[in-house]
């Protein structure tokens, strides 16, 4: 085992604070509408230009082991905020730096670190309760656009496109962000349920100009097995011929004689039919077939539940307003399933998402829920160069996370105002002793730090801006975008409550632990000078000083 170096007391805290400051100073220049960019060197490809706090934090590794420990702990703050709310990483870093700096000063002055931490924790619990009281629901499309715009660094086009996407696919819908081919951002919305399976034979195509199959008011047959014998399908096809309606078959596979007969009947116009493979594999396929059944009001024909294809009737089939099948995708639009059953299925999938521990499973469940609840929207980010594309895509993703957080827990006045108002309300918090009281004061001072940093990045005097905002009341705050004061809600400067809450909680949690540090242990760096080679006939000479 390698030898370790141990540093105690103030020496340890000074080194740790130096690491905290290096990381936080690199991150906090990005805060606010006039925040600057940070350029990150990549081992391959072009450098990455970003205004995303967590991206900057993740890149930082320091040479000094003790300084690096401080930096890594603050990096954890940014990562946690990003995982929980998807945004607010820079705010969390600024808060953590402010609490650690003030806290370590107090420890150096002889105060009890544990009491300081208790005071900070009490202040944060009270602040979170006040934040929730201050929060307002984010109901309309305009508020959603404003939240997205602020998070995307005041880019209104991103705010608009996210609001439109949410309006079209609903709050439970899936919105994904991709790199586009054009110069402008584009929104692609797939309404209804789409899955990635195309027609089994090109002879089903009835719209040659688009190379697709379109069925109006079709029946939908769902089968959880391979169909190779046409005899099994005859009762359904005979019943169908009398109605004159088209049929979509979704099965594990349709092959051989069965597929050939369907194609011939389709080409002769006896029955309008199209067949596609069921989406997914194994248990996921069974679940997705059940989703389609609930959406269309049909039944999955599966032998394991005692249903045979030969005995199926038209009552077992689902129906939809329209089905469009291309080479790669099948889209079922306006299934005729019962709304109550669809909602029950959505809440069941929601429960599975909460219980799942795998990110992959969560993503797939989220997609299934979206397809049942409304649809899927794809935002294609447009830019002139690859460097700009990556930077813009990161901003769109941040804005999307912020919007989701706003819909979940509501919004508070932005620009650091919410924390300042909350701090003024909990100034008289009751504590047990003077050291705890000072812990509360540290937390209250730290809550001003985001506002001060926004002002500094905008080229203003932080103290002047902070005092002006503190002298105001309610939603009154500083708009760094155009250097004016006024009602933040009216100016459309909103922050999601969840983002502000998570930033404060995670910053206080880790900063509180750092204040109570008394010793640090790290490996002693090895002197890796190579041994000297030996001269003729001699052995090596070992490392020389």
Swiss-Prot record:
InterPro entries (UniProt xref): Chaperonin_Cpn60_CS, Cpn60/GroEL, Cpn60/GroEL/TCP-1, GroEL-like_apical_dom_sf, GROEL-like_equatorial_sf, TCP-1-like_intermed_sf
Enzyme Commission number, as recorded: 5.6.1.7
An annotated Gene Ontology molecular function: ATP binding
Enzyme class name: isomerase
Pfam families per the UniProt record, alphabetical: Cpn60_TCP1
UniProt entry tagged with the keyword Secreted: no
One BP annotation, GO: protein refolding
Compartmental location: Cytoplasm
Keywords on record: ATP-binding, Chaperone, Cytoplasm, Isomerase, Nucleotide-binding
Main location: cytoplasm
Keyword Cell wall biogenesis/degradation on entry: no
Binding residue positions for ATP: 30-33, 51, 87-91, 415, 495
Domain of life: Bacteria
Swiss-Prot/TrEMBL catalytic activity: ATP + H2O + a folded polypeptide = ADP + phosphate + an unfolded polypeptide
GO CC annotation: cytoplasm
UniProt xrefs under PANTHER family: 60 KDA HEAT SHOCK PROTEIN, MITOCHONDRIAL (PTHR45633)
SUBUNIT field: Forms a cylinder of 14 subunits composed of two heptameric rings stacked back-to-back. Interacts with the co-chaperonin GroES.
Family: Belongs to the chaperonin (HSP60) family.
Free-text function comment from the UniProt entry: Together with its co-chaperonin GroES, plays an essential role in assisting protein folding. The GroEL-GroES system forms a nano-cage that allows encapsulation of the non-native substrate proteins and provides a physical environment optimized to promote and accelerate protein folding.
Name by which UniProt lists this protein: Chaperonin GroEL
